[in-house]
Amino acid sequence: MNKKLIMVLSVSIIIVFIGYIIFDTVKPAGSVKNETKNAAIVEIPDAWKVSAEFKVNEGYLKAVAVNAAGTIYLGGDSFVSCYNKDLKLIWNVKTPSPVTSLSNFGDTVFASTMEQILVMSPAGKILNQLGPFEDSCIITSVSSNKKYVAFADAGNKMVFILDKGGEVKKMIGQNDRHFVIPSPYFEVALDNENNVFVANTGLHRIETYSIDGVLKSQFGEAGTAPGSFCGCCAPPHFALIPEGFVTAEKGINRIKILNKKGEFVEFVNSKNNFIKSVPLNLASADGKTIYGAYPADSKLYIFNRNTTP
C-alpha cells in the first residue's frame, strides 16, 4: 500500500514538473517580465571622447577639481598642484599627508587628507587645517559652496557639514547609521542651494539631503544597464554638472551622464582599457569638459563631446 502511494506521488510530481516546463516554454514573449536589469543591454556608443591625457609627475594622482575659469587643481600622494587651462603648472605644494579629494569655491581650495581638511589660498599657501574630527576617520570626499564645507567620512559612515570656520553644524548618518559603505568610496557634493548630494555606495544610489540632514530624494539601483550602477559600491565618484550628474563606476569602468532625476542621458566613456576596479575621480565646471584623475597611471584624462558622426 505504501509503495503504491509513493508511486502515485512520484508520478504526480513528475507530471507537475513537466507541465511547468511546457508552460514556461510556450508562454508568449510578451508575458515575460524584465527579471533583471542586466538582460539584453543595447549597445550604446560613447557620446564623448578623450581629447587629452596629461601625466602627473608630482606624485601618485588621486583627485581633481576645476573652477569656472578653467584652473585645474590636482592632488595625491602627497601634493596639491595648480595648472592653468592649458595644463601649464602654476604652483605645487607638498602636503603633510596624501590628499584624498579636492574642492574649490571662489578663491579658496579645500584639500582633504584622511583626517583633516586643508584650507588653501589661490597661491597654494595652507591657511588652515580643519580637524581631526572623529576617531577612525577616513575622509574620502570634500565639497564646498559659499557658506558650507561638507566632507564624507567612510570610517564612521557619516557626512559632516561645517561652516567656513570649521565648526561642525550637522552630522548626517550619526543616529540612524543610514549609509552603507563597504569600501573607502564615499562621495559628497554641495550645490549653491545648499542641497547635499551623497553617494550611498552600498545601496547603489545617490541621495539628496537638506543642509539640516533631511532626506529629500534618492535614485539609483544595482546593475549593468546604462542607467544602473555596477560594482559592489557605486557610484564611487560623481560630480555635479548643469544637466545633472556625471558618475564613475567600477566593475565595469565607465563614466556616464544622468539628468537631475537620475535618468540615463549618455555615456561619456564606456569602452576603454581602464582597470575595472580603479574608477576615475571626476570634476567639471560647466558640463562641457569633464576631467578624470586616474590613480592607476597618475594621468589626468580630459573628455569632450564627440562631434564626429
Predicted regions and their residues:
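Eukaryotic scaffold repeat domains enriched in small/polar residues
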Residues: 2-309
